[in-house]
Amino acid sequence: MSGLLVFSEDLTKYDFGPDHPMAPGRVTNTISLARQLGVLDRLKIVPPPDIDLALLETIHTSDYIAAVQRGEPNQQYGLGTSDNPVFPGMHEVAAWVTMASAEAARKVWTGDVQRATNISGGLHHAMPGYTSGFCVYNDVAVAIRWLLDNGCERVGYVDVDVHHGDGVQAIFYDEPRVMTVSLHETPAYLFPGTGFPSEIGGRGAEGTAVNVALPPGATDADWLRAFHAIVPHVLRAHKPTVLVSQHGCDSHRRDPLADLNLSLDGQRASYLAVANLADELCEGRWVSTGGGGYAVLNVVPRAWTHLLAIVSGEPIEPITPVPEAWRIEAGESAPLTMSDGAAATFRPFEEGFTPGSRVDQAILATRQAVFPELGMDPSL
């Protein structure tokens, strides 16, 4: 199995400032940890290609791109807010992140590798004409559009970020060739306020938008139960040619911006589940990205190092010690192992519905909304 990372130090310049949660240390700490654990030695590493404005324009409007290039606050385009402050070189680095995800897609689609990742990407909130939720350009959507434009028949997109993947869903809402699947904290409590089960796709694409809105406090067992009750079934019905996934790790219980209760072990289990679906359904063709995640030291580097290891084809065992040199770099509170000590087990939904469970209610709501559109019985 061949795995590839698209990366250069230029991608770490995506930086909204020292007090912003989208800290570049999320990526630099991950690269350092992955290097010290030998994970980078098992991956091909290539830099992003030169910026291609025409590629950006397959998703984003020319006037919006021009506004980003000017680098000035502009409320019409969402630029200059507290979430999305303008910073020097914003257009260039956001475009490089986008080129990196498109290059990952190209490498997989042309058969150079089976698996490719861009941990700097996953900017799933960006809309065609405005910045949103720390996301300037929607690299995931550009990568998916590139696949479609280059002969890919169907794309499956799985988003495990705690926030709904609203930008990707909106962009492909009327596109039956793209199935977007998002598991997130309920929008009744959390940004961006979308991602209800009733959002199932536009006319002619019904059943290709799949939303699992989980209650605050959902655990590993809850999340994995929901994933396996829905995601394999809908993807098998869609029959994707390539699987694209976004791996925001802000579902972790220590993340400061959300309210789910997953462990690192549960997140690792989710990455393995996505990889297995790519192997089952797409002959291994899998393009992955990073995403959210704001516990910059204790969670993100370990989570994404696990992702990189899985992309390489050689997963890291959870009991693996964190290298002492990395812990010294990180400081006194650095974790000791690549695990939170959780079992990451779950009871399959098929073993029985629990009426009083808010998680089971969320699962059933999604199955009832989507399964009939795909010719499946939600009760089975």
PLM regions and their residue ranges:
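N-terminal low-complexity, Ser/Thr- and acidic-residue-enriched intrinsically disordered segments
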Residues: 1-57
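A general "terminal functional-core" signal
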Residues: 2-6, 12, 67-380
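Charged, often glycine-rich, active-site loop that binds/positions anionic groups
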Residues: 49-73
